[in-house]
């Protein structure tokens, strides 16, 4: 989605990353850039593999803590839905049956923090439609554009403290 943002950004994500791996990569991958803000979208791979929502929330809290410790403002982003059938086809990997409840739990936590609700455009969707993410997890250009529209609208409000 970063190519559709109205402000400069650096994409530090890694495909397949778990929330635990994001915590471990923080010092090496985030700190060298000395960002003022960190947009954090993580937990999808963990939750679809059956990692408990409480563990993902703990990882997100740890990333927030590390950000604040280094003078970075953490901004969490809610998790859009996935499409387990398409994930199975693309990666030959099963998805944890309770993924929806886990996503709901993590998103409820995120919505109580400084956040941008990037899942909002997809809330009425039970699963992510193929036309938005062929592989069921990584948004295609149209999904990325939809997420960027939300970020572009909400980011100025978040940094202004609204």
Write out the residue ranges for each language-model feature.
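Serine-esterase "nucleophile elbow" of acetyl-processing enzymes
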Residues: 1-15, 20-37
